[in-house]
Amino acid sequence: MSVLTPLLLRGLTGSARRLPVPRAKIHSLPPDEKLGIMELAVGLTSCFVTFLLPAGWILSHLETYRRPE
């Protein structure tokens, strides 16, 4: 590592430190009613089917996707 590296990095990040960072104004209230068991089951099942099932299918069939050498 060169002796100049810290100086170069400080020169690159120096101008970024002076920029104003906007703050998000997010306000939320507690839910009006709690979720029931059925809503939770439907939500978790749909997430599983949407994301994990296709990924598992692709990983289990990975050999068929490989290019022949």
Swiss-Prot record:
Phylogenetic lineage = Eukaryota, Metazoa, Chordata, Craniata, Vertebrata
Q: Name one GO biological process term.
A: mitochondrial electron transport, cytochrome c to oxygen
Extent of the signal sequence? none
Transmembrane stretches, start-end: 37-60
Instruction: Determine if Transmembrane helix is one of this entry's keywords.
Output: yes
What is the protein's membrane topology class?
A: Single-pass membrane protein
Question: Species name for this entry?
Answer: Gorilla gorilla gorilla
What protein name is recorded for this chain? Answer: Cytochrome c oxidase subunit 8A, mitochondrial
Topological region Mitochondrial matrix = 26-36
Q: Where in the cell is it found?
A: Mitochondrion inner membrane
Q: Where is this motif: SIFI-degron?
A: 2-19
Segments on the Mitochondrial intermembrane side according to the record's topology features? 61-69
Function field: Component of the cytochrome c oxidase, the last enzyme in the mitochondrial electron transport chain which drives oxidative phosphorylation. The respiratory chain contains 3 multisubunit complexes succinate dehydrogenase (complex II, CII), ubiquinol-cytochrome c oxidoreductase (cytochrome b-c1 complex, complex III, CIII) and cytochrome c oxidase (complex IV, CIV), that cooperate to transfer electrons derived from NADH and succinate to molecular oxygen, creating an electrochemical gradient over the inner membrane that drives transmembrane transport and the ATP synthase.
Which PANTHER family does the UniProt record give? Answer: CYTOCHROME C OXIDASE POLYPEPTIDE VIII (PTHR16717), CYTOCHROME C OXIDASE SUBUNIT 8A, MITOCHONDRIAL (PTHR16717:SF1)
User: Which residue interval is the transit peptide?
Assistant: 1-25
> Which InterPro entries does the UniProt record give?
Cyt_c_oxidase_su8 (IPR003205), Cyt_c_oxidase_su8_sf (IPR036548)
Q: Please report the PTM annotation for this entry.
A: In response to mitochondrial stress, the precursor protein is ubiquitinated by the SIFI complex in the cytoplasm before mitochondrial import, leading to its degradation. Within the SIFI complex, UBR4 initiates ubiquitin chain that are further elongated or branched by KCMF1.
Which Gene3D superfamilies would you find in this protein's record?
Cytochrome c oxidase, subunit 8
Q: In which pathway does it act?
A: Energy metabolism; oxidative phosphorylation
Q: What family, per the record?
A: Belongs to the cytochrome c oxidase VIII family.
| Principal location listed in the UniProt entry | mitochondrion
Q: Which UniProt keywords apply?
A: Membrane, Mitochondrion, Mitochondrion inner membrane, Transit peptide, Transmembrane, Transmembrane helix, Ubl conjugation
This protein's assembly is summarised as: Component of the cytochrome c oxidase (complex IV, CIV), a multisubunit enzyme composed of 14 subunits. The complex is composed of a catalytic core of 3 subunits MT-CO1, MT-CO2 and MT-CO3, encoded in the mitochondrial DNA, and 11 supernumerary subunits COX4I, COX5A, COX5B, COX6A, COX6B, COX6C, COX7A, COX7B, COX7C, COX8 and NDUFA4, which are encoded in the nuclear genome.
Protein origin, superkingdom: Eukaryota
GO cellular component assignments: mitochondrial inner membrane; mitochondrion; respiratory chain complex IV
